[in-house]
Regions:
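Bacterial Sec-dependent N-terminal signal peptides
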Residues: 1-41
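Beta-propeller blade signature
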Residues: 185-193, 236-246, 288-292
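Asp-box/WD-like beta-propeller blade repeats and closely related beta-sheet repeat scaffolds
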Residues: 107-114, 124-132, 136-164
Length: 358
């Protein structure tokens, strides 16, 4: 079998380790500015984009596909229209209007976007075996990096679900499912941010990873694990939060599903060493866990009940934005002690995604 892993040398490993920064969504070192908060709402039929103003969530909205993800980069807001639409749109945050929208092939399912440089972004495609670089000015694809070598078995895609950036390195998180089953642990791949050249890969400790983030110079990865017979997740050691050791090229558990109460559906990291995890027990039962990564301790935030509507941490204000889709659903702002609900119009759809634009 042809060897497909391009192993980085010891010197290059050391380089991208020392290049790590807490601001994992930016490719430069500009100081963080106060952010504008956007919220995406969705039900079974439609989706809408709103924004937070002085009075709460806006009355005005922009319509998008119901399964969309929103991400802010350099004053712009990217809308990733996913299953059933497969589009990428750029919203001008100064006007709250769509600047352009481009189509991907059916089923390519854009899953994440990060800054490549001041003129381009990298876009993850969960439903296709590739990462694409896209021009910010018009949405045109400028480069394609194939990832089919990471496909599991007969699968046609390695299921790229999350991207992150540290220094000049692009990190890609692959679930590697096959026929809707997770037979092997997830995979972390490192690329040159500038041109997508593969540097190295590391096999993760657990199956079905969902998200990653940097804290105290370390990369943490959250995993949902395999589903049980009722399509929930078990409180066992087959899932949880792990930390990557780049020097040893391995990943080990920090806290598992026993402590958390289940697998991690969504994940946000305070760069100072606290992780917030949406613990998916079963449909509608998704509590918020606050994890001290150094102490490996877990506490449950009691003010919310179903945080499947997204988690985003604001590095500047030191607060966590929470999308709760439970009985007291809405957009919440958590200061580390208390979660406060932000006022919203009565016709606003349940929160499905949150983004910060600065």
């Amino acid at each position: 079998m042809k060897k497909f892993l391009m192993l980085a040398t010891a010197s290059s490993l050391a380089f991208y380790m020392t290049a790590c920064s807490d601001n994992s969504t930016s490719a430069d070192d500009d100081p963080l500015k106060p952010a504008s908060v956007y919220v995406f709402g969705a039900d079974s039929k439609s989706g809408e984009l709103r924004w937070v103003n002085e009075d709460g969530i806006s009355d005005k909205s922009l319509q998008f596909h119901k399964d969309s993800r929103i991400i802010g980069i350099d004053g712009n807001l990217f809308v990733l229209e996913r299953f059933g639409a497969d589009n990428l749109a750029l919203v001008d945050a100064s006007e709250n209007e769509v600047s352009w929208q481009v189509d991907f092939e059916d089923g390519e399912n854009p899953s994440d976007v990060v800054k490549a440089n001041k003129d381009e972004v990298w876009v993850a495609l969960e439903g296709a075996a590739k990462i694409v670089k896209v021009a910010v000015k018009d949405g045109k694809i400028t480069k394609t990096v194939k990832t089919n070598k990471f496909n599991q078995g007969e699968a046609t895609t390695p299921n790229l679900v999350d991207l992150d950036v540290s220094g000049d390195t692009l990190f890609a998180l692959f679930q590697r499912s096959e026929s809707y089953a997770f037979k092997v642990p997830g995979l972390l791949a490192m690329y040159k941010l500038s041109n997508g050249e593969l540097l190295d890969t590391i096999k993760l400790a657990k199956k079905n990873p969902t998200a990653m983030g940097f804290a105290d110079g370390k990369l943490y990865v959250a995993s949902l694990g395999e589903y049980n017979e009722t399509y929930g997740t078990d409180a066992d050691d087959a899932r949880g939060i792990e930390v990557v050791d780049f020097a040893k090229k391995k990943s080990s558990m920090v806290v598992d599903g026993k402590k958390l109460g289940g697998g991690v559906y969504a994940f946000a990291v305070d760069p100072d060493g606290v992780a917030y995890a949406a613990v998916y027990k079963t449909w509608g039962d998704v509590p918020l866990a606050k994890v001290n990564l150094s102490e490996k301790s877990v506490k449950t935030v009691s003010d919310v009940s179903d945080v499947s509507g997204s988690l985003v941490f604001d590095d500047v204000d030191g607060v966590l934005y929470i999308g709760d889709r439970g009985s007291k659903g809405g957009l919440y702002k958590y200061d580390g002690k208390k979660a406060t609900k932000i006022d919203a119009p009565k016709d606003a759809l349940p929160v499905y995604g949150i983004a910060l634009v600065r």
